[in-house]
Amino acid sequence: MTNWGPTGELVYNRTYSRTKPDGSKETWPETVRRVVDGNLALVDERYHLPGERADLIRLMEEFKILPGGRHLWASGVKNAQHLFNCWVSGWTEKPSDHFEFTFMRLMEGGGVGANYSNRFIDYGPVQQELYVHIVCDPDHPDYEAMKEAGVLSTEYDPDWAGAFVIEDSREGWAAALVDLIDTHYRDEVSHFQRVYDVSRVRQFGAKLKTFGGTASGPLPLARMLIDVCEILSEIATEGGQLTGIAAMEIDHAIAQCVVAGGVRRSARMSMMHWKDPQVYEFLRIKQDTGSHWTTNISLEVDDEFWVAVEEGWAGPNNRILRELTEGMVANGEPGFWNSSLSNVGEPNEVVCTNPCGEITLEPWEPCNLGHVNLAAFAHGNGSYDITGLYRAHRLVTRFLMRATFSPVADPKSREVLDRNRRIGVGHLGVASFLALCGWKYSEARTNEEFKWLLRSLAEEVDHAATQFAHQLRIPVPVKKRTVAPTGTIAKMPGVSEGIHPIFSRYFIRRVRLSMSDPDQTRMLADYGRQGYEVEDDLYAKFTGVVSIPTQDTLVAEVIEHYGQDSESLVESAADLSLNELLGFQALYQTIWADNAVSFTANVDPETYNADDVRQQLRLFGGLLKGATIFPEASMPQAPYERITKEQYEQATAKAVADGVDEDCANGACPIR
């Protein structure tokens, strides 16, 4: 019997349970066996430990270890073992390489980070002003919708011999984008009218077998090609060069195309260096344009930045910090990323993080994540299973190292993956673990036993990685430990997410389900019949929202073990100061994570202003590889809404274990 968290089975069925050949859905034990067997098959059986398969199955079924979402979705799937959640897209001598890589990884269901600092982007003038014409067979089911949207050419038709016929595949879509961008950069072009035939692209709503979800049809692709052409043609008309901001606009157009299906999600991270000539435009790009909603925004800082801030607190560097912190307090962006601190211990330069910020990566490199659920090893009487924790960390390390042998689509990624073998062993359920051990979250920084435990577990990971690398005759992973937000993963066992404190002891949790997916549509109907409030999403098409009054189950667990007066052991985000939140992140960054820590410090904008945040960043800036500070603002259909204990008791409630927002902008990851 699976011991689900209160919304765990819903999240599992929505996100990770695959449809079997007979049309039925996987159960959790079936998913676990698929994932474990797929992972073990990546290396020869002689490299398996005695009983390793049985141990992995048991620990995963009990939610004591959980690999990253891509592993749960794709491991063991024939011809589709795309096991890596996120990537960094770099820049080569050919501008289309970056955009092709971004498009392909997003279409595979991954997230992509990129550094748009202009020092990376030097391609000379855009040579050609072009015009895109979209043509389509009138018998295509989406023809009328495309005609109504105004994207079809009035000058060309599908019979024109010079049309570029777009094949109905990820590679086919990307080939059309590459053709367009490369043509913009050619010295000589015979045809300035670029005609793209979308007749072979499957219709809107068709099922996508490999990655799940439904097809968006040819309309979003047509719009993307038109948008990209307009961006580059405007630059060509002015005799200009591609800039970091313009490249962001192209990637935004690409991401909009990918998410248009209603089920598929994309996640992106955009960075720019603090000394870049476009930095002020970058810092305000979302507010000023109302666009770029497909990406998170983070400012690249370094040691020079923090020195300059201290030496010239009232100077221009403070202006950048002021813009940064005013944005944080207003809407949670930008965050910052410390490239100097992140490059310590790296054999080659890392240029960006994945969209959630827990892994710093070289160009083309993927993140490779797995997690140990600390809460599952707490006995609830002040003790914990230290032997079990060691075993779990050792097995997750080996699991992720085997995953580095999985196929990747791009040879640039293969080269860096083989060279670095980077893994990210992380924790979830940390706040739950602390409370069940009788320790307060706010006191963890001075808790010597907890700090000893983190150091000991880090040593176990490092030892296991070194030992296994020598057996496999591969390089020891350049870095091994991280903290991911685990927003979706943690919901299955119903524990706190990553190292975040719980959101609130009592709250309304809103679950979003896609109306484009038949299974999720049935879930919406079931919730409505049970009396829950169900409404259309105000922010996303084809999406419904279910509101569930909630008591965080950690409260009940702690009271069960420590008595009615122990509720104060469970500290929520609202109980903690910004200093305590950033201090906890710094603890994990300095003791546990050689990669990075993804963490969102939620603050009340009525309590903290930009000056308050600036002072805290001055204290912690040199210790943290990155930070995201998010204002808790009341908004319609917020994923979480605090309520009082009395309000909860008055409601018809289901106990739900939860933490922070699943939305990537709030520090968690929508990529499964």
Curated annotation (Swiss-Prot):
Keywords: Cobalamin, Cobalt, Disulfide bond, DNA replication, Oxidoreductase, Redox-active center. GO terms for biological process: DNA replication. Its cofactor is adenosylcob(III)alamin. The keyword Oxidoreductase applies. Coiled coil: none annotated. It catalyses: a 2'-deoxyribonucleoside 5'-triphosphate + [thioredoxin]-disulfide + H2O = a ribonucleoside 5'-triphosphate + [thioredoxin]-dithiol. Disulfide bonds join 86-367. The active site is at 356, 358. GO terms for molecular function: cobalamin binding; nucleotide binding; ribonucleoside-diphosphate reductase activity, thioredoxin disulfide as acceptor; ribonucleoside-triphosphate reductase (thioredoxin) activity. The keyword Oxidoreductase applies. Its EC number is 1.17.4.2. SUPFAM superfamilies: PFL-like glycyl radical enzymes. Belongs to the class II ribonucleoside-triphosphate reductase family. This is Putative adenosylcobalamin-dependent ribonucleoside-triphosphate reductase. It comes from Mycobacterium phage Bxz2. The gene is 50.
